[in-house]
Regions:
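Divalent-cation
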Residues: 1-155
């Protein structure tokens, strides 16, 4: 099962692992690699529709986990109205984190996770120094990835 790892940009730099579907993993990967399909795929279509209807994705927020399922929100702002400061969304739409991330990487929107969620489900990132055996750390990480299950992140 594919997994996306979100990392805190500063501070403790914990990792938030989220299991996702193969189709969403492919959508995220192709967008990060800058590959463009000959015809718009689902998340490309979502980005096009936002633009056509005068909206933009201000940010996504991974909000919670319930029964081993993560939840996210799209924070949309109207781009064709005066006075929109972008701080308060005009619309908040609940969605799967994988879809939110796939859309965010396409349009360059920031990705956030609720602090209490990171406190609950975040994993400490290994700090690698020059003295550490990088191969051993990589092997440990591979073992973690191969054996991880949704139950490992249950509250």
């Amino acid at each position: 099962t594919p997994m996306v790892l979100l990392r805190e940009p500063e501070g403790r730099r914990r990792l938030l692992p989220i299991l996702i579907g193969t189709a969403e993993a492919t959508a995220i990967h192709t967008s990060l690699e800058g590959l463009e399909p000959p015809r718009p795929l689902t998340h490309d279509l979502m980005a096009i529709l936002l633009g056509e209807f005068g909206a933009s994705l201000a940010r996504i927020v991974i909000t919670e986990v319930r029964d081993h399922t993560f939840y996210a929100e799209l924070h949309l702002v109207a781009t064709d109205t005066d006075g929109a400061d972008g701080d308060e969304p005009d619309h908040v739409i609940s969605c799967r984190p994988s879809d939110a991330i796939a859309l965010a990487v396409r349009v360059g929107a920031p990705i956030f996770a609720a602090e209490d969620l990171v406190d609950e489900c975040g994993q400490e990132a290994a700090v690698v120094s020059d003295d550490d055996d990088a191969e051993e750390i990589i092997d440990e990480f591979r073992d973690f990835i191969e054996n991880v299950s949704p139950e490992d992140f249950a509250p």
